[in-house]
Amino acid sequence: MLLTGCDKRPATETWKPRSTSGQVEYELASAPIDAPRPLDHPVTGKLPVRFVSYNLRNYLTMVRHDDDKKSMRSKPEKEITALVSVLTKAQPDVLGVCEIGTQADLDNLQDRLEANGLKLPHSHLCSGSDPYRRQAILSRYPITVSPKPNINFQMDGRNFQMFRGILDVSIQLPGGPVRFLGVHLKSKRKVPEYDEELMRRHEAYLLAQHLAKLGDHPALLLYGDFNDTKRSTSIRSITKHLKPLNLKDKDLSTWTHYWEYQDVYSRFDYIFVSKRLEKRINHAKSHIISSPEVRKASDHRPLYVEIN
């Protein structure tokens, strides 16, 4: 069976851990879902705020193949170098990522970005039932973590959890607060244990339930790797609540993922916004980042959005 990059099993981290200053954990208090605790003080900074969403393609330690040999290794250095170059050129103020490993992996990425001129001191790591691949968000501004959303569901009489959970934070930006939701839905790889499409629909339904609870939020941005196309049931369950941004690259192409084995280009990565936040989006400057370095860094392309 062919294993895609999204499903190979990794191991523990090899990076050296550092202090946890600037990192936050989930708060499990029973606060209202639309009212995370306020920040201690307002922030100052320049507008527009630059946001990037990026699937990093296994920024973690795992079994990798080289000349028919298997060994436990971290993400190849040439891929990391390209990835860091892409991000430092984009200079995001807020960065949402998929396929990050442990806290040590997140620390490593944070340190490399800072060493190359991109300081994002605040971070949050989010996980679901997948013990290896997680989501994270890094920010120039302080992060407030919302109460953890429900990620439990039943399918075919069995209990499951969303593989990577729902990342839910609020960030006080210079133009006003924005609530960021991040997801990484089940991949399209077939598995014998369950129907992967049905699994993805259940995950999308949980996300839609969470969006419904938030209601008409004044500034909500949902991003991530949805592993599905825009007319799919999973995506349509989201567009009932939020509007997708029609991002394109400089050649007006919309694909965000390349599957080299089958030579297939797909749009799996999206950014959705609430009606009121859409008015703050600079559509002319928002786009899909495309460059030779992007192809070296990951099988996904990053999404770039400017918020006023």
Feature annotation, model-predicted:
Residues 1-4:
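Sec-dependent bacterial lipoprotein signal peptides
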Residues 6-115, 125-128, 204-205:
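N-terminal, active-site-proximal structural segment of metallo-dependent hydrolase catalytic domains
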Residues 7-38, 211-220, 227-308:
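Metal-dependent phosphoester-hydrolase catalytic domains
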Residues 38-41, 68-74, 91-99, 125, ...:
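Second-shell loop/turn segments in exported
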Residues 54-56, 83-107, 180, 206-236, ...:
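Active-site beta-strand/loop signature of hydrolases that rely on acidic residues for catalysis
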Residues 54-57, 98-101, 125-129, 140-141, ...:
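Active-site-proximal beta-strand/loop segments in catalytic clefts of secreted hydrolases
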Residues 65, 174-202:
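Metal-dependent phosphoester/phosphodiester hydrolase catalytic core
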Residues 100-179, 185:
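Structured beta-strand-rich core segments of catalytic domains in phosphoester-bond hydrolases
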